[in-house]
Design a protein with these regions (language model features):
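C-terminal effector-binding regulatory domain of bacterial HTH transcription factors
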Residues: 122-131, 140-193
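Hydrophobic hinge/microswitch elements
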Residues: 89-136, 141-143, 158, 162, ...
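Alpha-to-beta junction loops
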Residues: 15-20, 41, 112-117
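Secondary-structure junction motif
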Residues: 65-88
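Beta->alpha turn/N-cap motifs
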Residues: 6, 23-25, 45-47, 103-104, ...
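Central regulatory/effector-binding core of bacterial HTH transcription factors
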Residues: 1-29
Length: 193
């Protein structure tokens, strides 16, 4: 779990760490951040929450109980970014809420229990979307794309075995991502028939 403000100030790299997979850039500029993939993040809530507290656009989030992520805290709020639907323009929205979580999984659990709106990666909520536990808050595709990176020390400061493990790990992650993106769920279902 990232420390408070790590998303905006950069993530600390522990001395006993060889590789750190993160959506936040490193705080120390002497570290390397190798791009792995991008993923979309948007707002989700339970149908029950949305029936009681309707929302249609990100600028309405200020009137809702948003489930905050500790690493994204600025004072008593999070800044959630969304691309303006149909454009590449990005806008920031300051959101507040009754709950602060140190990871997305606990934030998702609160949202599943009708306690607010969660800002989560689309891949993290696929099963919730399929079974109707969570639904997107917006009809239009308001989302924010984040980079997933592997952070490590420059190669000249690493033992050979760490370089080897890092190269193999990144190769395998990229290979699995490429495979998962080749077959969308509906294609996978068709190929099983």
């Amino acid at each position: 779990n990232l420390e408070r403000n790590a998303f905006y100030e950069g993530v600390e790299f522990p001395d006993d760490c060889d590789v750190l997979i993160s959506y936040a850039p490193p705080k120390d500029e002497s570290l390397v951040a190798s791009f792995i993939t991008q993923y979309a993040v948007t707002a989700y809530a339970s149908q029950r929450y949305l029936e009681k507290h309707p929302i249609s656009r990100p600028d309405e989030l200020e009137h809702h109980s948003c489930i905050l992520i500790d690493s994204m805290m600025i004072d008593d709020a999070n800044i959630w970014r969304f691309n303006v639907a149909g454009s590449k323009e990005v806008r920031d929205y300051r959101v507040k809420g009754n709950y602060v979580c140190d990871n997305t999984q606990s934030a998702l659990e609160l949202a599943r229990n009708h306690l607010g709106i969660v800002f989560a990666p689309d891949k993290s909520v696929q099963s919730d979307l399929q079974d109707g536990t969570l639904v997107p808050c917006f009809q239009q595709p308001y989302e924010w794309w984040l980079d997933l990176v592997a952070i490590f020390r420059k190669r000249e400061y690493q033992p050979w075995r760490v370089q080897y493990v890092l190269d193999e790990m990144l190769r395998e992650i990229r290979h699995q991502l490429a495979q998962s993106q080749q077959l969308r769920p509906e294609q996978a279902a068709e190929s099983e028939d």
